[in-house]
Amino acid sequence: MHARFAAAFSQLPAELQAALTPVMASDTFNAVITAAQVDAIGHACHLDRQALSFALLPLAAAYALTPISHFQVGAIVHGASGNLYFGANMEFSGTPLQQTIHAEQCAITHAWLRGETALASITVNCTPCGHCRQFMNELNSGTSLPIHLPGRHTATLGDYLPDAFGPRDLQIKTLLLDPTHHGLMLDNAASDPLQQAALDAANASHAPYSQAYSGVAVETPRAVYAGRYAENAAFNPSLPPLQAALILPNMSGDNVNAIRRAALVESRQAPLSQYAATRATLQALGCNDLQHHPL
């Protein structure tokens, strides 16, 4: 089991520790607890799904990277599949605060990148900030998404974000988490797994306002990870593709400071580009090898 969990794990009831150990001690654990595992753990510990999620929040918060705030936030997304996806806030030294990934963004994007196409609810250890409320309003669940907080009655996103402005006000039909494919093509991408991963991510990205479809793939000594752009009706809460890509190595127990090379695929004709911000953030993380493929 990864050392990051030691303190939080030691505080769990012994029965829950015993049920979780086979799952979390696995070398393949990637911050996802499958529906079958949720049922088995809940049965062994006499916990329903929501009680289990509350108990797991400290483990989700253990994924936080907080060199600036030193304040850990954990979130757990309940996918429509029954899986639970961990998320935590991620900050990056040497970059503007705007490059921060909030815990709710992390958990939701984590679920999206793992193939989830709808959410049942989200559980967070702190009240969602306005930025995250607006980010969640881009989801295909809309304002009906249930939000669970310790010590509070369950409320919906609509309760936290009344009179919301979102994609439906702009007649956007394809929403965040809806499957899509933009038809971008890159010659010889199949010869390089990094390029292919970035291309696949760009084709699945959500950018209905700018059509700036984009994806980033990063390579560490362990694996290639890819992330997609998640645009927002309010613009500023949009999550850049690099940030999405950085979620996966962190959730997989890898090191975001161990990136050897990266690739950005994006629409050439779009009114904006991810290149400058992607390059600057990668350089802050110690990576200077960025391939750029405008299509």
From Swiss-Prot:
It catalyses: cytidine + H2O + H(+) = uridine + NH4(+); 2'-deoxycytidine + H2O + H(+) = 2'-deoxyuridine + NH4(+). The keyword Zinc applies. One of its GO terms (cellular component) is cytosol. The active site is at residue 104. The keyword Iron does not apply. Substrate binds at residues 89-91. GO terms for biological process: cytidine deamination. Belongs to the cytidine and deoxycytidylate deaminase family. HAMAP family: Cyt_deam (MF_01558). This enzyme scavenges exogenous and endogenous cytidine and 2'-deoxycytidine for UMP synthesis. This is Cytidine deaminase. It comes from Edwardsiella ictaluri (strain 93-146).
